């Protein structure tokens, strides 16, 4: 057996070989070759059933195998199983010959197979013979050396209901552990999986182990483990971080407490990043606890929060330049199903930024940088689970374009919205060269996962499969370069005040011609209010919230609006996807009109923290609180919203951040300017609104304006008029809120599931598109004189996306929790 390439000794724990426990009906013969044949036949069947209508299908759109290369995938997808195998065999011969390998024997073998094909056509026997021949050549590639020692986990699939609920409703069946697969080379120098051996570093049979990752020197492995028996009597069982040496010794638990700690990632300075529920917030859009990015010393001390997101995040990995790449969920005023995208952040928690994915119909997981390339490899996941096809992302094509995506497992259709599949699918790609990737693959009709090697040309070869238990998260166990340690430079004066600083060079950059210079007067900083968890008497935090919509800041199951039209230039909204909500129509001027039909206003509580002035040259310079989920809104002189940031941003204490404009092209260099006007003076403090910077309450802020100016006529006495009283109905919804929202008098972005992804054009949503203000401008309302402050209460509410309550109190308990100063409850 090969020694680890790091030079450390292989462990002396017993070596195990898998028992062949797959049903006899699944195998042609009960041997390793029978398992390989099973994998081959599964591959043949999935290619035959390739979806011809999906946007990423090569039967619909062709794509190259390498960035900027010739069309490749469409022709390959149209071949029979034998034709495709022989084509890939021929291409593989050419690529390895170019590396200097002697492939004369394979050329003769290919010629013989082609002769057989003329007589046998697409027979099973010929297909299997061709696949075995290609497999033997594939394993000769010298670039597969990192696959000689593969770290992975054995565990049963969790099968959660959502991609963010594994810790709540996943099915953690005990068994497995942290293992190393040692793959020898045969006499001809090729990898020989038939004689591979498995070594157990950590026995997880009394629970479930997951997500192992080796330190940069390859001598320590970090992972998460959840024991079947809770560590504290009366508590649930939790995922906690563990470490073990690669000689199999020194296993120890690193974290503890009523929290789930998962997905470790070694940091360049020797610390560990990880994902945790220590944020003690709920994942809004359903029931479970949220989990976000943290860091700590490798002994479990000095735990520090890096991400202040309100939703969940997972699977962090280091980039070559020293940042953390990970998946973040965010639904800031948009539908949920495509809101799981790729982000990066510095290890000190500063400068989180989108890497890829907003406004595409896909979700992205397990992203890794591809060596010797600007590409990323990832799994195209769904809102429902963490598996799907493996895709390459060509970042030179932009941050939001589906043209940047190439599925290299096109026989697996992407899953959309809440779709999920546990068979004939992939997850956990790990690059070992520019062209090759370790993956977990469930090849057949059973949800059973093995370890595969695949490449960007559509080749895939089984490396290891245990018929008794799934094998997941393969990574090379070897030393690897340590990324640079990025400098930290917080401003101590700002940090002491719990603040950071933002500067914007020119808010008009990115707005196009829709907003004339001089119209933007204010930048408003708003907050998504976190839904903190209830602490239970036993010391744990509440883990589920059924029925979940009764814990929302707006009961969207009890009140919703009408269809809204919004203008966009995002072509992804027209894609060949099964969107569950709304429609999109192309306009003659190159834009699209998206109709959103779900009618859900914001179910997240919001707060206006304050505004700052926009200088004459469009620049802004201001301080803002650190540790909060923020977003920006650009306002005119009347506080009408011109454009909205439908993503989130944060600050660490003392952090300084800058941007070029509002919705600018982030792949373009900003215009060179002299010092902006806003930077010639000290940073502005946020000016809070007249009602205060606390979470926004419709009843506290908006209803008094309606009482003063509207209720004298709109008192519910006449059915043809809106009832704008604050009286609560049986659902605890004010009559005024229901009338304005359900009657279609206000315009907002739809939060419903299944919505289309798009970036809205300026001034095509919110206050400026609301019928309410059109009605107020008509003659019959000539005597309604709103003060500037009263008008601002209405515009702020609409442009916060019409939230109702400032908190997440369980709806049936709201009546008892209501301050007496708020509007009365209707009598039964």
Features from the language model and the residues they span:
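Multi-bladed beta-propeller domains
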Residues: 187-207, 245-260, 297-311, 346-363, ...
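Residue-level detector of Asp-centered blade-edge/turn motifs that repeat once per structural unit
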Residues: 145-146, 216-217, 267-269, 319-321, ...
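Structural motif
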Residues: 175-177, 231-242, 282-292, 334-343, ...
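Residue position within the beta-strands of beta-propeller blades
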Residues: 151-153, 159, 220-224, 272-277, ...
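Aromatic- and Gly/Pro-enriched helix-to-coil junctions and flexible linker segments
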Residues: 1, 12-77, 108-115, 125-132, ...
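Loop/turn-rich, solvent-exposed surfaces of beta-rich toroidal or solenoidal domains
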Residues: 365-453
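Asp-box/WD-like beta-propeller blade repeats and closely related beta-sheet repeat scaffolds
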Residues: 229, 235-295, 301-314
